[in-house]
Amino acid sequence: MNLFTEIRSLVTAELGAMAEAGELPAGLDLSAVAVEPPRDPAHGDMATNAAMVLAKPAGKPPRAIAEALATRLAADPRILSAEVAGPGFLNLRLRPAVWQGLVARVLQAGDAYGRSTIGAGQRVNVEFVSANPTGPMHVGHVRGAVVGDALARLLVFAGWDVTREYYINDGGAQVDVLARSAYERYREAHGLEPEIREGLYPGDYLIPVGEALKAKYGDSLLDKGEHCWLTDVREFATEMMMQMIREDLAALGVEMDVYSSEKALYGTGKIEAALQRLQDMGLIYEGVLEPPKGKTPEDWEPREQTLFRSTAHGDDVDRPVKKSDGSWTYFAPDIAYHYDKVTRGFDQLIDIFGADHGGYVKRMKAAVAALSDGRVPLDIKLIQLVKLWKNGEPFKMSKRAGTYVTLRDVVEQVGADVTRFVMLTRKNDAALDFDFDKVLEQSKENPVFYVQYANARINSVLRKAREQGMDVADAALACADLDRLDHPAEIALIAKLAEWPRLVEIAARTNEPHRIAFYLHELSSDLHGLWNRGNDEPGLRFLQDDPVVSQAKIALARAVGVVICAGLGILGVTPVEEMR
């Protein structure tokens, strides 16, 4: 139920009629024809570029096409006017009945309004968070977790079959550091002084791990060489860290479908199989890379290595996959992991990475393009840093983690709902300021409060109407005398509701869930604006002396509430019915 799609269908149907009448050549490609909100609302309700994109293939001036199309469109009962602007743009105004009818359609559809089928039949894997299992999640992980989970919810809303996945980085040197750090806490649990050397993890969160190791192993690991305990302690500590991470994610309202282990790729032939596939395609060779400019990456060697010809698929330089000593680079298991996702049959892959992984984007896209023969697109979203503020000062420390602010620090102070919404108030690749004081302010400068307050206002109107004996069930409101909604401010609010299905599809196609938060703020602003105008213009108040008029206005308010709740659901935020 997308009004823009419906009007576009009308436009393309009339273009087809023009072709049949000989006014346009037959067989024109209409895929670039769009119907969108105009840049300036004063110009109309919708605008189409049809004449502009068809002028060249049709061999006609765009204005001539636009004028002929305008005449045809004006004859449709939904169109109030069709006016040609500039060189050939066409601005459309819809009749009030179209907007009024949309309110009923929203109420009849309920939370299905705005849902789409554009992703139907397509499987997408969204990998996000994938934090090293070495400690509590920090505030940077929070933003990635929220963006990834909101994106997954958005894609489900738009029809995709979504798998949420976490890649456990348990195959590298950092889990050995974790084991050594946990062992010192194990010694501490036995009353010995821990030796938290430079390079080990200092946080208090490892104290319970040490105590758990003591409970399981007693003193059997004391005074033993590292080779005797490293493997057992590493696996034990990693599992405890993953349990902590799962609990952190749950506190934020995030639940993964799949946890994949990097360690499981080693010794199983999966890395070898992925690289063999690239080898069979002629994309693996032995060579020496030119020394890089600037900072030297850790996988560069001034000697022959096994290289992936990633430049064949858009990368800037070829990438090492095996070092001269025969060990794998960090990139090799990542190739194998993404090949595993390709072989699981996903139609699309999405990775949510921290901004520090920017140098990984081209090589990873090259690998997936090669391994899938270009069939499976990989979209990588980079998450920029979050700067924390409290009492007007940077907020940096956490006793629990030792060096950084944890997810729990944030959620315990402001709650999961506020945290999630604020993390989506900027595009993922823009830095974000998170002020613990401002996100709890009850002011219109606080987008979380502003949207929730709009929903609370709507619910207050519904409660008062019920107290007056009015039937405010959606079915009853959908049958209200909606032609009473004739004020330009009311029509403008309905027009904003009409944008919701289109906005959902755009956000889903671009993998940008922040668009939902932006839209909710705009919709709430329009609702508040109409509400506040009622203070000076009694005719705009939602509750009137005439119950017929009241029911129509309440129907509009309820329709706004339906969309706000649907949008908050995509963001993973619980709607508030009453501000406290």
UniProtKB/Swiss-Prot annotation:
Keywords of this entry: Aminoacyl-tRNA synthetase, ATP-binding, Cytoplasm, Ligase, Nucleotide-binding, Protein biosynthesis
One Pfam assignment: Arg_tRNA_synt_N
Keyword Hydrolase part of the UniProt annotation: no
SMART domains xrefs: Arg_tRNA_synt_N, DALR_1
Catalytic activity of the protein: tRNA(Arg) + L-arginine + ATP = L-arginyl-tRNA(Arg) + AMP + diphosphate
A molecular-function term among this protein's GO annotations: arginine-tRNA ligase activity
Motif 'HIGH' region location, chain numbering: 131-141
Listed Gene3D superfamilies: Arginyl tRNA synthetase N-terminal domain, HUPs, Isoleucyl-tRNA Synthetase, Domain 1
InterPro entries recorded: aa-tRNA-synth_I_CS (IPR001412), Arg-tRNA-ligase (IPR001278), Arg-tRNA-synth_N (IPR005148), Arg-tRNA-synth_N_sf (IPR036695), ArgRS_core (IPR035684), DALR_anticod-bd (IPR008909), Rossmann-like_a/b/a_fold (IPR014729), tRNAsynth_Ia_anticodon-bd (IPR009080)
GO BP: arginyl-tRNA aminoacylation
Top-level enzyme category: ligase
Entry-linked NCBIfam families: argS (TIGR00456)
Subunit structure, as described in the record: Monomer.
Protein name in UniProt: Arginine--tRNA ligase
